[in-house]
């Protein structure tokens, strides 16, 4: 039996580009649509506009400041999105 490695493991990669319309096929935002904002090739992840929203709580640095809550889109693995043909 042949051992599977990255070199002999074959799968079809999607050709995603910035600005493509995609649909989420897995996760909390399933069946939602959005456009690709950024692609992280080293991790095989994409950032989709308006999808996978996360919050980051920031403590005040000085005594006269107030804390903040930043909202941002977290990356999604490319296997969880499907390109929509227009």
From Swiss-Prot:
Gene behind this protein: rpl24
Location relative to the cell: Plastid, Chloroplast
Gene Ontology terms: biological process: translation
Chief localization: plastid
One GO CC term on file: chloroplast
Subunit structure: Part of the 50S ribosomal subunit.
Functional note: One of two assembly initiator proteins, it binds directly to the 5'-end of the 23S rRNA, where it nucleates assembly of the 50S subunit.
Organism domain of life: Eukaryota
Keywords: Chloroplast, Plastid, Ribonucleoprotein, Ribosomal protein, RNA-binding, rRNA-binding
Protein name: Large ribosomal subunit protein uL24c
Alphabetized PROSITE patterns for the sequence: RIBOSOMAL_L24
Family to which this protein belongs: Belongs to the universal ribosomal protein uL24 family.
Gene3D superfamilies membership: 2.30.30.30
MF terms (GO), sorted A to Z: rRNA binding; structural constituent of ribosome
Pfam families, per the entry: ribosomal_L24
PANTHER family associated with the record: MITOCHONDRIAL RIBOSOMAL PROTEIN L24 (PTHR12903)
